């Protein structure tokens, strides 16, 4: 009886989502979880196989960790991500993860990740388990660097206990119902949190008991028309209104705020767009603004073209035009990442004092047997 009721509840939820969408939703992937005595809504097996092929380490039912390009560069060649230049982040101590790698309420044209599941099953994985398993996964993904003569031993050992958690890998992390608890645990373990959100769930941000060390909001559209064309809400026609609520909420949040503009040539970089971006930025009053160029890679190649990829000079031109309109200046830039930092002054991100420590026997995640790719 309980199982039937739960299944009906889930299917009813998806039916409601389908009513808000112009496209039908696929079948929910259900599996019995003997540990909890209930049904778990698992990740789409085809998507999971693709993510594993791309070297994601899946954590729990919907979470995941993947080694950042700049983490590898820091270990092998002592090169730093632009976050190192802008905020003092040591790339080899940064863990890139998401509690929901497979779900998002938008389908942005510029997103280079694999398309997400077309269901929104909120995940409530235990936050301490998520943290421990993510660190174990990070150690597994970095394990091969330990035997590389090009990697300094000291840096490799430092990388085993991350100091920064970039909650930005894939999906929309504010769909994780225990996000606040997770970030609190990160801070208590002496780690910063850098949360990236699309800003369409303002109530989640408003109700967070623990805020991230640094909150990034993707401000990729200067107006509703561009938002609908570029960010492509899946179900909610009022997503732009929710996004504007987030913009107006940001000044009240007691944490570091970054508005990030992903720039696409011929899409959102005109002088008119810059003026509209400035209006949004002035309402948000962030500590920093990042102007970052779209890169023609991955799934985004199905939506955009090489011509939409701005040069670094294009990024600087945009930034130099925007900065005076928001009473800020261009503080720094990174040509390899095609990004410029706009703000009033550079202030390194503060690392919290550790109150808790990882268990000595935390260890490393075991190798994962990857799922075979499923041909559509």
Annotate each predicted stretch with a short phrase.
Residues 148-313, 321:
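Conserved AdoMet/S-adenosylmethionine-binding subsite of the radical SAM
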Residues 89-105, 283-293, 315-321:
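Short, solvent-exposed linear motifs at loop/edge-of-secondary-structure regions
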Residues 39-42, 46, 50-55, 310, ...:
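C-terminal accessory extensions appended to soluble enzyme cores
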Residues 92, 160-162, 334-338:
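Short Gly/Ser/Thr- and Asp/Glu-enriched loop/turn motifs at secondary-structure junctions
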Residues 104-107, 224, 296, 349:
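Short, acidic Gly/Pro/Ser/Thr-rich loop/turn segments
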Residues 134, 138, 142, 247-250, ...:
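Hydrophobic, Leu/Ile/Phe/Ala-enriched alpha-helical segments that form helix-helix packing faces
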Residues 2-110, 114-119, 123-136, 140, ...:
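Flexible, acidic/Gly-rich N-terminal and inter-domain linker regions that tether
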Residues 130-159:
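Short Fe-S-cluster ligation motifs
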């Amino acid at each position: 009886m309980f199982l039937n009721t739960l299944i009906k509840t889930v299917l009813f939820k998806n039916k409601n989502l389908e009513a808000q969408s112009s496209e039908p939703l696929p079948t929910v992937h259900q599996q019995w979880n003997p540990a909890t005595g209930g049904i778990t809504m698992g990740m789409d097996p085809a998507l999971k196989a693709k993510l594993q092929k791309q070297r994601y380490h899946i954590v729990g039912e919907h979470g995941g960790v993947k080694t950042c390009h700049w983490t590898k560069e820091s270990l092998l060649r002592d090169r730093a991500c632009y976050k190192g230049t802008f905020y003092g982040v040591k790339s080899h101590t940064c863990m890139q993860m998401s509690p929901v790698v497979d779900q998002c309420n938008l389908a942005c044209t510029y997103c280079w990740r694999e398309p997400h599941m077309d269901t929104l099953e909120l995940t409530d994985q235990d936050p301490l388990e998520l943290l421990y398993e993510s660190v174990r996964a990070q150690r597994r993904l970095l394990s091969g660097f330990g035997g590389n003569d090009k990697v300094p031993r000291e840096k490799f050992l430092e990388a085993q206990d991350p100091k920064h958690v970039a909650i930005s890998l894939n999906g929309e992390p504010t769909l994780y119902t225990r996000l606040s608890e997770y970030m609190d645990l990160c801070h208590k373990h002496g780690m910063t949190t850098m949360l990236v959100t699309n800003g369409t769930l303002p109530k989640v941000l408003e109700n967070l008991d623990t805020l991230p060390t640094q909150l990034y909001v993707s401000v990729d559209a200067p107006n509703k028309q561009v938002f609908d064309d570029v960010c492509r809400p899946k179900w909610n026609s009022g997503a732009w209104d929710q996004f504007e609520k987030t913009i107006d909420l940001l000044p009240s949040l007691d944490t570091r705020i970054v508005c990030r503009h992903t720039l696409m040539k011929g899409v959102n970089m005109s002088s008119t767009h810059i003026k509209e971006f400035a209006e949004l930025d002035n309402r948000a009053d962030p500590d920093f603004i990042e102007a970052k160029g779209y890169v023609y890679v991955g799934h985004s190649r199905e939506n955009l073209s090489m011509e939409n990829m701005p040069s670094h000079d294009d990024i600087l031109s945009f930034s130099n035009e925007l900065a005076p309109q928001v009473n800020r200046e261009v503080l720094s830039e990174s040509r390899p990442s095609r990004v410029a930092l706009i703000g009033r002054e550079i202030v390194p991100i503060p690392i919290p004092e550790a109150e808790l420590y990882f268990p000595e026997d935390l260890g490393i995640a075991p190798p994962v047997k990857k799922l075979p790719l499923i041909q559509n």
